[in-house]
Amino acid sequence: MTPNSFAYIVFLVIGALIYHPLPQKAKKPFLLLLNSMFYAIGGVKFLPLLALTVAFNFFAAQKLERIERKRGLLTLVLVLNLGALGLFKYLGFFGELLGCTGVQLSLPQLALPIGISFYTFVICGYMIDVYRGREAERNFLDFALFTTFFPAILSGPIERSKSLLPQIKQPRRANADDVRFAAERLIEGTVKKVLLADNLAILVNTAYADPAQFSGLELAFAAVAYALQIYCDFSAYSDMAIGSARLFGITLMENFHAPYMAQSSKEFWHRWHISLSTWFRDYLYFPLGGSRKGKARTYINVLIVFALSGLWHGAAMKYVLWGLLFGVFQVIGGLLTPAKQRLCAALHIPWDAGWLQIIRVVITFGLSTFAWIFFRADSALQACAIIKRIVTAAGACFPLNLTHLGLTERALHVLAVSLIGLVLTDIIGDRFPLREKLLETVWLRYAVWVILLAVTAVCGAYGTGFNPQEFVYFQF
């Protein structure tokens, strides 16, 4: 049951309608029931593992708070939590790595419990917070709701205890503004997913299925299409998760802020998957020393963080290389930026000149798109082959015929218009509160909702040849 399905909307609306009229004492047990039902629908066989994880960490946190020698227990708890993640996610990968050393060991690839990468990080962050002095949660029901909240458990945002737990402990009734906000985010997410991400996926999947059949120009277009697809797909899920939570009076953190408007790779990660990047910053980068121990150590820390970020995404070398690429981009950016600023000063060019900002945005988008090739390719070898074909412009064709990539001409027109709308929304919304201003007028708000839903229904969910795709981050 995915957030863009009719079944999910029914589940969400009925759940919210039952939840709010309930007596205060009944709200939390009912919400836990909703969480359990939602998770069971996606993978009932993994529900006992989730329950065991929640119970173990609830009691471990209280023990951690009481004892004086905390480091040993924290290490044990983190090893057990991350070990469970590693068992399900990386066992087969470690077998492959051993094979590279000549040791032949056949290790099974276990089925991945849904949401385990996300709820494991939520729990590990909570345990580190307790180690650092946060009071351990005493109410098991509150802790269970915090770790299993259904809008966020599949693909985030990766929430923190200081933000989400107080909202769970003191439930708030959703008001009219919450309902309007929820509707806006659910509609926005549906449009991004159905009109943009799923149509872009057809282009991308066609090109990456057999790259040798396409020209360098077509593969370059597919690379750009994937950069846009994964943004629309993942931000769509985050929109729907944030909107769903608001129906229960709960505010989740924003996960994206116009990432392709970033002017550097460092800024990109301040705007992209914000809950994950801040998690790595607070629980790994800062403990490693951050930027406090000199430039060399800072850059090493950056590379470590990005390599592990890549590994978190998947058990394959291509993900590690993807992460390292972003780390290298940040290191090079950190080394070159002072020189570039001095050059601008010498030439009397303002660093914040509009045309210069545009150039930086384009370069950053290009670097991000390059890295995404490794993320999407079947392997690092395939990624290198695609890059080679793009760079050498093998089989370049003009004019570009995009119907080769699986979409009809009509679908391409719809996609083009939708992309223009997305780009304009991000450009304007990056500098001005676009959504708030546009939707201040009641009739305009409802007109926008109706138009977007109608276009999505005609050209997307019920349109000719519509091919629904699973959310990309569900595999992680």
Where are the predicted features?
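Membrane-embedded transmembrane alpha-helical bundles that form the catalytic cores
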Residues: 1-425, 429-475
